[in-house]
Amino acid sequence: MDGERELPAGWAWAKLGDIADTALGKMLDKKQSTGLHPTPYLRNVNVQWGRIDSTDLSTMDIEPEEKGRFTVSMGDLIVCEGGEIGRCAIWNVPEPIAYQKALHRVRPSSVLETKYLRYYLEHAASSGKLVRFATGSTIKHLPQQRLREVPVPLPPVAEQRRIVEVLEEQLSRLDAAVASLDSCQGRAHGLRSAAMTVALQRVDDAATKRLGELIKEPLRNGHSAKATSDPFGIRTLNLTAVTQGVFSDTNTKLTVADPHRVRDLWLTRGDILVQRSNTPELVGTTAMYEGADDWAIFPDLLIRVRVNDDVLPEYVTLILQSRRGRSYFRARAKGLAGSMPKIDQSTIENFTMPVPSLEVQERVVVEVRDEMERVARVSSELDRARRRSVGLRNALLCTAFDGKLVHQDPRDEAAQVALARVTADRAAQPKTKRPRKAAVKRSAKAPAPRAAEAIGPAPEPTPAPALAVQQEFDL
């Protein structure tokens, strides 16, 4: 049907709209809200692959007579219309729930198992089959009419159930392995922090100084300017460079900054950069620049620290990145409700730290760096295994929908036969008319005043046109 491949015996291609009923949810319109019927509803963000997170639900006004139209019932498949198109999950809760227009409600007919469709849409999304049905250049959308055109390889219903059974058995094992990998990755991150803590315990007895006593020049905020496509623009870091500790072209942008104004903001090796504003978890995040001099400037949300010869910049960076440093900045960050918490230069200057000899500082830096490299190797292997798990999942789904996962039973009713029956049943059903909105009565306009001196008799009045009733827009 879609020209992709030949199907196994007993299978058939069918457009989704021919084997399932689809409907979009209610459009969110705060202007029309009366506040009389607040109803929890599902949004795009609530629907993930194979699961629905209903812990954070918004509410909107839905009239009682609309609830049947804009709710999902137990067993319905909910499909994302935008963003990651095709992402879907089954509503398995007895109580119905409303849903927004960013979601499709799909109710398969008797020839299509809901779980089979759920896994097929995952396969179609991961393999790129859904892209040609999407609209939009930046944020992709899957309009209802396009969703209904998606071709589905349809095995006999009994075979669909066998496919789902094997998929769930194998995927549950794969999911358990992935959960274990994620747990190990979390412990690897913990090892980084532990390694730093152990190394820094060796300098607890050293004399302490304020960071303000260890700088060779005043702290400096950066400068932010509008981005430009001009290749001769000023390369400027973004916050991600410091958050990730990765100073690359990817984490910069070219800006229209005035070269004269930013002449003192070019980075040099050993510059320490501290985020002066970010989320509560990230404010105070620190990284040291180790690249070539004059490669980029830094933005206003970063504060540059240049230390004197009493301390190694690598050592100071470790102290600021430690649990003690992170806790210090979080505790002193200030911000109004709804705004990003901030720290200022004095907060950084007043941070106290142990200052051992340069020889001890270097030993600490080398010890932490060696441990970090070992942890990074472990983390890299875990990432590689995680990517392999994605490949295994995709391969399993591909095998299933190529008809190679389970055996074909000649006793099963062929999909073509079942499709013909469903088509005949649908044709025999009377077409239901869509409800129309009630016409709004309009007050008659007052007649225009007659001219003071009318010439000749007044013309006969023309019949008023009938009031048009707009048919309800198909959501």
Features from the language model and the residues they span:
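A short glycine-rich beta-alpha junction/loop motif
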Residues: 9, 81, 97-104, 112-115, ...
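Short coil/turn segments at secondary-structure boundaries
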Residues: 29-37, 132-134, 208-209, 224-232, ...
